[in-house]
């Protein structure tokens, strides 16, 4: 973080620990990185693909490079090779060619598809703080991280926001095996216990007996009118009912729904909107202090090509940058020492 601040990109930390540029624009990060790369003479070649990679008996790496648009082939011999190809299938193919194993990649950090037409009508409604628990069939082990607290957003196809993205990250592999089906239980009043919610509803009923229930939602809940209407509809309460006509049983049912509102997850976001991938090169096959392969000397990995995936909020970027920094400095130091030794000889 200090590196970006020192290079002109101011950062901010959200209440839930997520880190973003103050500009709220990813281009601030991209422009900073590109600017620094150009300053130190990095050669950036685009429109090319490394199609094959092999290790020679002399400790070199033989690379076949092709252009995407024309019939062009180039062969390069490299002293060092750093694979930082993200979740690109081509990157995984290079990994396999170099005899590394791959943990099957699955999507992570995605939104939840909820087939609920009434919920879809609320697209754009945000909740600053909810407590959400993801229940997955046949997953009996206790996974504390499948309960998360944070902001949530209603979309045209379901639910999104930091709390949902974190749940998708912790449940990525189980969700994949279950066809992205499960039950999401949301507490819309996480700072109030059940008895508090019941008491607030009862007091509100006494205070606003002659008002329509739709037009008078307890302010303590912090809910927008559109969502309050959704809650009432789920409890089959007629919108023009007066508070005076609502039974205590109905009040208890509303309280239960606010504290334990269940949604059936039927898939992940419809636009292939996952941000990262879980899976990749096992960490057991690299030396984390240098990011060097344990199979081939002078072969390095960094970023999402490794079996590492973080929650939302900058953690995956940090993993890529930290791993890239370690790998780059390791290569630089090794090359410097090798150069000195060759000069001595």
What are these regions (language model features)?
Residues 77-121:
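Glycine-rich loop(s) and the adjacent beta-strand/alpha-helix scaffold that form part
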Residues 50, 74-87, 94-96, 152-155, ...:
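Short hydrophobic core segments
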Residues 44-48, 65, 104-106:
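Short loop/edge segments at beta-strand edges and connector loops
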Residues 16-35, 45, 84-86, 90, ...:
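Short beta-strand to alpha-helix junction loop
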Residues 117-140:
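Extended, Lys/Arg-enriched charged tracts that mediate electrostatic binding to polyanionic substrates
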